[in-house]
Design a protein with these regions (language model features):
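Short beta-strand segments of immunoglobulin-like
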Residues: 27-31
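A general sequence property marking short-to-moderate contiguous segments
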Residues: 15-25
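Bacterial N-terminal signal peptides
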Residues: 1-11
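Non-catalytic cap/lid and distal C-terminal segments of serine-dependent acyl enzymes
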Residues: 18-20, 32-400
Length: 400
C-alpha cells in the first residue's frame, strides 16, 4: 500500500512537472481572436530580444546561392511586459494553415506554448490553422468518412533497397471488392514520404473532397524521392541521422529509373485499375521535375500529369554516375507524350516563385507545339500554401 501510494505520488509529481501547474504567468500561444488576429506569447523574463518569423507575415527577399533573391517569411519583434511575457498581435489573418518560429536572442525555437509542430527537412515549425473558408475547411479533420494512411515497405530491385511509401486508401477500401485508380504524389527536395501527408494535409484533403463528391475515391501513393534513402530520417537502418536537404542521387535519373518498381508493387499489393486512364502522377518542385521526366519516359503509363512549382529546365542533371538518358531529348519525349493524348497535363506556379520563368519557358514550348494543358497561376512563391491549393485543384479533375 505504501509503495503503491509512493508510486502514485511520484506519477502525480511528474504529471504536475510536465503541466507546470501554477508556475509563472498563465498565457496561451497562439491566441486566436474573434477577428482572426492572433496573439503570440512567450514567457522569457531573462531574454534580451524575442522575435517571431512565419508565413503569416509580409515576405522579405533574401539571397540564396544558386537561386538569386527568393521570398522568405518576414520577421517582427515581440514586446515584453512587466511579468516577463513577450507578445505580438498580428493583423487579422486570412484562413490558412500557417507555420512559424520564435527567435530568442538569435536562437530559433518552436513556440513552447503550442504543442502542434511539424518537421520540414531539418527544421521544426509551430503550426496554426485559421479556418473559415471552403478551401481551408478541406485541410481540417471533419465529420466525414475517413480513409486509412499506412506506412508500407516495398522492395526496389532497381535501387537495391527496401524502401518505404505512405499510402492512403479511401474510406470503405477494406470492406470493398472494387478496384480503384491510383494517384502518385511526389515531394520536393529534402522532403520524404511524410511530407505530403503532414505538411500537405493530403489525407484530410482527399477525405473531404471525396465526401463532398468532388473527387473520385482513389488510392494515393506518396513516395520518397531520395533514392539513396530507405525512408524518412530517423526511421531507417541508419538510425537518427541528421536530416539534410542535399542528398545524393536526387535529380540524376536514378529515382525516375526506379519508379516502375513502385507501380509494380502497388498493382501487385492493392486492388487497383491497371491502365493509363486510371493512373495519375504529380509533384511539387523536385517532385514536379520527377513527375515530368517519369511521365515523358513512360508515355503509356499516366493519363494525368501535374507539375506543382516544378523544377523544370533544359539542364541534363545526370552525370557519369547517373542516368543522363532520362533527361536526353526532353522536347521530343514531351511531343511523344502528347501524341498519346493524355487526359490532363496540369501546371501550377506562384507569381513570385523563383521557378516562374522556368515554367513559363516550358509553357512557351507547349504553346509552340499546340499541346493542350491546364494552367493555374497563384499569388506567392515556393511555399506549401500554394502546393496545398494545387492539390485541391488538381485532384477533382482526376479519373472523370
Amino acid at each position: 500500500m505504501v509503495v503503491a501510494a509512493l508510486c502514485l505520488m511520484g506519477s502525480a509529481a511528474q504529471a504536475q512537472q510536465n503541466l507546470s501547474w501554477g508556475q509563472g504567468p498563465q498565457v496561451a500561444s497562439p491566441d486566436v481572436h474573434a477577428d482572426n488576429s492572433v496573439t503570440f506569447n512567450l514567457i522569457a523574463p531573462e531574454a534580451q530580444k524575442v522575435q517571431i518569423t512565419g508565413d503569416f507575415l509580409p515576405t522579405q527577399k533574401i539571397k540564396v546561392e544558386g537561386y538569386g533573391k527568393v521570398e522568405a517569411p518576414g520577421v517582427v519583434d515581440l514586446v515584453k511586459n512587466d511579468k516577463g511575457v513577450w507578445s505580438f498581435t498580428s493583423e487579422p489573418l486570412k484562413p490558412e494553415l500557417y507555420t512559424y518560429n520564435m527567435m530568442v536572442d538569435g536562437v530559433k525555437i518552436i513556440d513552447p506554448l503550442n504543442v502542434y509542430n511539424i518537421r520540414d527537412i531539418n527544421n521544426l515549425f509551430s503550426v496554426l490553422l485559421i479556418g473559415g473558408d471552403a478551401r481551408t475547411d478541406l485541410y481540417k479533420v471533419n465529420k466525414v468518412a475517413h480513409g486509412t494512411v499506412s506506412k508500407v515497405w516495398y522492395e526496389s530491385p532497381t535501387a537495391g533497397l527496401t524502401r518505404r511509401l505512405t499510402v492512403y486508401t479511401p474510406a470503405g477500401y477494406e470492406k470493398s471488392k472494387k478496384k480503384y485508380p491510383v494517384f502518385y504524389l511526389l515531394h520536393g527536395i529534402g522532403g520524404d514520404e511524410n511530407a505530403w501527408s503532414e505538411l500537405g494535409r493530403a489525407a484530410q484533403i482527399l477525405d473531404n473532397l471525396i465526401a463532398q463528391g468532388k473527387a473520385e475515391p482513389m488510392i494515393l501513393v506518396m513516395t520518397n524521392g531520395n533514392i539513396s534513402q530507405e525512408a524518412c530520417p530517423g526511421e531507417t537502418s541508419e538510425g537518427f541521422k541528421v536530416p539534410t536537404m542535399m542528398l545524393p542521387k536526387t535529380m540524376e535519373g536514378s529515382f525516375e529509373t526506379a519508379f516502375p518498381d513502385v507501380v509494380k508493387f502497388i498493382e501487385k499489393t492493392y486492388r487497383v485499375k491497371k491502365d493509363k486512364a486510371h493512373r495519375a502522377i504529380a509533384g511539387l518542385s523536385m517532385g514536379g521535375f520527377h513527375s515530368l521526366f517519369i511521365s515523358i519516359n513512360n508515355p503509356d503509363m499516366f493519363g494525368y500529369v501535374g507539375l506543382f512549382s516544378a523544377a523544370v529546365d533544359q539542364q541534363q542533371k545526370g552525370g557519369a554516375e547517373g542516368h543522363p538518358e532520362v533527361y536526353a531529348d526532353r522536347d521530343q519525349k514531351i511531343d511523344c507524350l502528347f501524341s498519346k493524348n493524355p487526359k490532363l497535363f496540369w501546371i501550377g506556379i506562384g507569381k513570385t516563385d523563383f521557378l516562374f520563368k522556368n515554367n513559363n519557358d516550358l509553357r512557351s514550348y507547349l504553346d509552340s507545339k499546340n499541346h493542350k494543358y491546364t494552367y493555374l497561376e497563384t499569388d506567392g512563391g515556393h511555399i506549401w500554401r500554394n502546393w496545398r491549393i494545387y492539390l485541391t485543384e488538381f485532384t477533382p479533375l482526376l479519373f472523370k
